[in-house]
Curated annotation (Swiss-Prot):
Naturally occurring in which organism (per UniProt): Halobacterium salinarum (strain ATCC 29341 / DSM 671 / R1)
GO annotation terms (biological process): DNA-templated transcription
Annotated localization: Cytoplasm
Family: Belongs to the RNA polymerase beta' chain family.
GO molecular function: DNA binding; DNA-directed RNA polymerase activity
Catalyzed reactions per annotation: RNA(n) + a ribonucleoside 5'-triphosphate = RNA(n+1) + diphosphate
Name of the molecule in the record: DNA-directed RNA polymerase subunit Rpo1C
InterPro entries, per the entry: DNA-dir_RpoC_beta_prime (IPR045867), RNA_pol_Rpb1_5 (IPR007081), RPO1C (IPR012757)
Cited function: DNA-dependent RNA polymerase (RNAP) catalyzes the transcription of DNA into RNA using the four ribonucleoside triphosphates as substrates. Forms part of the jaw domain.
Keywords for this protein: Cytoplasm, DNA-binding, DNA-directed RNA polymerase, Nucleotidyltransferase, Transcription, Transferase
Enzyme's top EC category: transferase
Amino acid sequence: MTEFDVTDGVHDVIEDTELPRRLKDEVLATAEERGVTKSQANEIATAVEAQYLDTRVDPLDPVGTVSAQSIGEPGTQMTMNTFHYAGVAEMDVTQGLPRLIELVDARKTPDTPVMEVYLEDEYAEERERAHEVVWKIEATKILALGDISTNVADMVVRIDLNEDTLQERWPRVDSTTQIAGEVAETIEGNLGVTVTQDGTILEFGPSEPSYRELLQLVEQLRDIVFKGIEEVSRVVIRREETERGEEFVLYTEGSAFKKALKIEGVDATRTSCNNIHEVHKTLGIEAAREAIINETMTTLEEQGLDDVNIRHLMLVADIMTNDGTIESIGRHGISGNKNSVLARAAFEVTVNHLLDAAIHGESDDLDGVIENVIVGKPVRLGTGDVDLRMGATQTSD
């Protein structure tokens, strides 16, 4: 017997196939669920193996060219617009062709960085608990907590914190005075001034009487983040139907993936980010590869182009992450780093590449598709890379 509750005969039939481990496990799980006999298992395994072998790429198949065509042709039907995110009011997310270009160019920061934050347990079920996570993620500036005024005669900046706002955002804190004290400490740490506190009223000023310094303090105060993640300007909360039932999901404007995963109540196993470089830094290159595939597929599906085979996107992601870092597909990345002089020159800045190659005395082995097309030689792919030899056997008279 095995970890699957099937007979040894069924197990041996499935294990003798050429299927990869993942597919074998899926067939074994199905055999366990359906309670199949050995003969039935043999039929199933044979059919699955035939399908699997049929989907494998033939030797010398130009997979790169096919992938480029299969992604590029649907790309001509994509829109150039930035749309609202589906179902989320007032949240703009780059979609269509601009988003696809962002991904293959491996831009360091997307035009509209977004995180999709899933929550754990009661945080996902209760709106009040979900809002607690919202206030931990969304950058709360001191300006949003009360009224700010300046007294030029006394050279004092006065902050009158709104008690209702403080209680709404931090309902589990014992008193608003305690929160006001934390605000005062934040101001002192950022501005280097001494803050006097009277309940929820804070006052501070420049060390020396100066109108200019007073105004500078007010300007600096505008940028101070009291709570939350500085990079996240807004969080939208939605109730959605997921594989776990109905739950609250957060969508952010701005991203700081590593910081978000550390927040209590955030489900790190399902939370995602549309910045592939942040995913790489936080979870590693394999996660970045998956992110590239998922983001690219999602972008195509949003445009009604979901019939693009995911293996084309997997090939692109494999090439972009092949050396352990994320490389763009362009003259500053993969295309610009090819060994072939003619292939580099055919992509962009032709004269520069040819001039550099001449200066450094480079040669071209004509191994790839582009360079052989340029010089008019048969491409070394498919039948172009196969030598045929006629066999002759001597027969006796």
